[in-house]
Amino acid sequence: MQPDPQPHGRGREKAAGAGPRLPPPVTAPSVGRPASVLPHKTANVRDHYRIGKKLGQGQFGTTYLCVGKPDGGEYACKSIPKRKLLCREDYEDVWREIQIMHHLSEHPNVVRIRGAYEDALFVHIVMELCAGGELFDRIVAKGHYTERAAALLIRTIVGVVEGCHSLGVMHRDLKPENFLFASTAEDAPLKATDFGLSVFYKPGDKFSDVVGSPYYVAPEVLQKIYGPEADVWSAGVILYILLCGVPPFWAETESGIFRQILRGKLDLESDPWPSISDSAKDLVRNMLIRDPTKRFTAHEVLCHPWIVDDAVAPDKPIDSAVLSRLKHFSAMNKLKKMALRVIAESLSEEEIGGLKELFKMIDTDNSGTITYDELKNGLKRVGSDLMEPEIQALMDAADIDNSGTIDYGEFLAATLHMNKLEREENLVSAFTFFDKDGSGFITIDELSQACEQFGLSDVHLEDMIKDVDQNNDGQIDYSEFAAMMRKGNAGGANAGGVTSTGGTGRRTMRNSLRVNLGDILKPNEN
């Protein structure tokens, strides 16, 4: 990942006469890490809450179930390791996230913050528990939905955008995964979560740091001069996916996706669009106008007939093929992650000899794991000129559990070149690992065993099979497995197995999408 040429943390160009950012940033030393994230000492989170089971693993922290000691109420606690915060700007990012959650806490469709706590190792954000699951998962589980249902969802999503903008907040990472239902009840409200990339802004402010998630990022973000209009584009992408099951602009690589976003044609003609109402298509067009000055504002979206008038959005079920595509799109391909790790650990001593010695040299305390500081110091000793964000990206590609350390196998998976991982004998070796009975096929039972070995839970095994199973026989043969491993690796896939559609880097979040405009703007190869 190449750092942006501008200084880290400088991402905004002020319009003439624009005032200072509100609220003011944390008072901190101008260099190095500040003493704390929060501007005041806090109680220990465990004095007020019992921390329970892990609910989820994000890129920036781990979320746990917690129970309030006074009231017995259930909440979510997001714990962010402070060792992941490398500099003053990272500390400010976390503090800003907390401020923004408080700032928006009265909105009925924003997850409500309960409080923030800090100790020597973590910042803990306690918030409302949303136990109803992600937006797309609910739709897929239900098995059918209508344009009218999609209109209600978009009304909620864009209502959050309008609420943010009216309070001087830009979300900057709107995507379906960041919307959760409050409970499993049929009428549970949809809530926006994860304000880790959000910023305060004033009218006229322009930003230049490239953040977000590939399918949902607006073209002006890629061009590094944007404002709150970018949130409306992202909401428009969600609407497009709700209506047809796939993103409007897609390709096999990140750079290909970005090229399509900048100049690809918006398809509103092929199936299922002929059966979608003209009013819905009109709204999609106006939310996905590349010129942000001509794009609908959030308020204009909420005033559109398709949103306002229940009679305009048809109540007939949307084609079941859309639901099927939506299911596949939203299912994460965990199989590839596991396979990359298997290959990395089975390579020959000759291929990994240098890396093995490097690992030993970096692991100064011979613990069998390396920390960020050990990695940074070790690379410096061998003359590496990697910048801190690049070292952190290397670390984080392997540190899947946010433990702050990586073991030998993880180190290999994160540092080996993709061409070694793709060699035929290595693919055969990885396939054999999953094909426990040597039948020549990976079955759903064998996948289940592998997931258990890798500590993966809540995995949709059927979807993992379907993502790869080209001939629809319910299992994965070698040719299908090899095609999956080679798919999408051109143009900067990383050997750590982090999917190209997985959003931003780690806590050092600015300029986190690997955007090379020269690469994006080159002529299409097809």
From Swiss-Prot:
GO terms for biological process: intracellular signal transduction. ATP binds at residues 55-63, 78. The keyword Nucleotide-binding applies. It catalyses: L-seryl-[protein] + ATP = O-phospho-L-seryl-[protein] + ADP + H(+); L-threonyl-[protein] + ATP = O-phospho-L-threonyl-[protein] + ADP + H(+). Gene3D superfamilies: EF-hand, Phosphorylase Kinase, domain 1, Transferase(Phosphotransferase) domain 1. Residues 313-343 are annotated as: Autoinhibitory domain. One of its GO terms (molecular function) is calcium-dependent protein serine/threonine kinase activity. Residues 49-307 form the Protein kinase domain. Pfam families: EF-hand_7, Pkinase. Keywords: ATP-binding, Calcium, Kinase, Metal-binding, Nucleotide-binding, Repeat, Serine/threonine-protein kinase, Transferase. SUPFAM superfamilies: EF-hand, Protein kinase-like (PK-like). It comes from the Eukaryota. Ca(2+) 1 binds at residues 363, 365, 367, 369, 374. Residues 1-37 are annotated as: Disordered. Ca(2+) 4 binds at residues 469, 471, 473, 475, 480. Activated by calcium. Autophosphorylation may play an important role in the regulation of the kinase activity. PANTHER family: SERINE/THREONINE-PROTEIN KINASE. May play a role in signal transduction pathways that involve calcium as a second messenger. This is Calcium-dependent protein kinase 28. The lineage of its organism: Eukaryota, Viridiplantae, Streptophyta, Embryophyta, Tracheophyta. The gene is CPK28.
